[in-house]
């Protein structure tokens, strides 16, 4: 957040769309592939004369009427191999105000992570089979203007009222998404 106790309109809009994305992922269930979203101002989408009527009606039903309100536009499913590297190669058109993604991960307590083998494949096997492992779903969003928001749902506590939220819960994914929004060298010239 912005450092003050009162969030800005873009921060509220981002938090709302990230929570909506996470709840949509929850309705789809667990064991889903990562999904990438373009975050676009809803007013911009509604101003598109080529927007189908049924899509416009759906957008209007969730729109708060503000210029800050964001809609999540699903992109192609992503490979889960090296998500941060894939994000580093993305480029978004200027109409996109931000980006978001959902991804599922297995996490373990820090003391268990410290015991993991150094070999990456052996470490994955170790963590995936450890009795202290927990499956989580992350929804992470960032705006070009710098704001970020994350929502984290743990599989053992799979309920909307148990979703953790914060501006930087997953720093590596926040940074990778933010980098995908950086202007391409040709755009800077």
Label the model's feature ranges.
Residues 35, 56-57, 96-99, 180-189:
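A contiguous, surface-oriented mixed alpha/beta subdomain in the mid-to-C-terminal portion of proteins
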Residues 1-9, 53-63, 115-123:
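Intrinsically disordered, low-complexity linkers and terminal tails enriched in Pro/Gly
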Residues 44-46, 107, 146:
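Short loop/turn segments at secondary-structure transitions that flank enzyme active sites
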Residues 110-189:
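Glycine-rich, aromatic-bearing surface loops/beta-hairpins
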Residues 64-135, 142:
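Internal, well-folded beta-alpha domain core
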Residues 1-23, 27-30:
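Short N-terminal edge-element motif at the start of the domain
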Residues 22-76:
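N-terminal interaction modules that seed assembly of large macromolecular complexes
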């Amino acid at each position: 957040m912005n450092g003050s106790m009162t969030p800005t309109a873009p921060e509220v809009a981002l938090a709302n769309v990230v929570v909506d994305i996470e709840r949509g992922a929850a309705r789809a269930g667990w064991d889903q592939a990562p999904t990438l979203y373009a975050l676009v101002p809803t007013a911009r989408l509604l101003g598109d004369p080529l927007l189908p009527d049924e899509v416009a009606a759906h957008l209007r039903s969730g729109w708060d009427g503000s210029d800050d309100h964001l809609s999540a536009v699903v992109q192609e499913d992503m490979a889960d191999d090296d998500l941060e590297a894939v994000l580093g190669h993305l480029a978004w058109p200027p109409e996109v105000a931000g980006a978001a993604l959902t991804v599922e991960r297995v996490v373990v307590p820090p003391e268990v992570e410290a015991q993991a083998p150094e070999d990456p494949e052996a470490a994955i096997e170790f963590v995936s089979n450890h009795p202290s492992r927990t499956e989580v779903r992350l929804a992470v969003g960032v705006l070009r203007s710098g704001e970020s928001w994350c929502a984290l749902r743990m599989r053992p506590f799979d309920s909307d009222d148990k979703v953790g939220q914060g501006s930087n819960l997953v720093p590596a994914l926040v940074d990778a998404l933010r980098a995908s929004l950086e202007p391409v060298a040709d755009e800077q010239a």
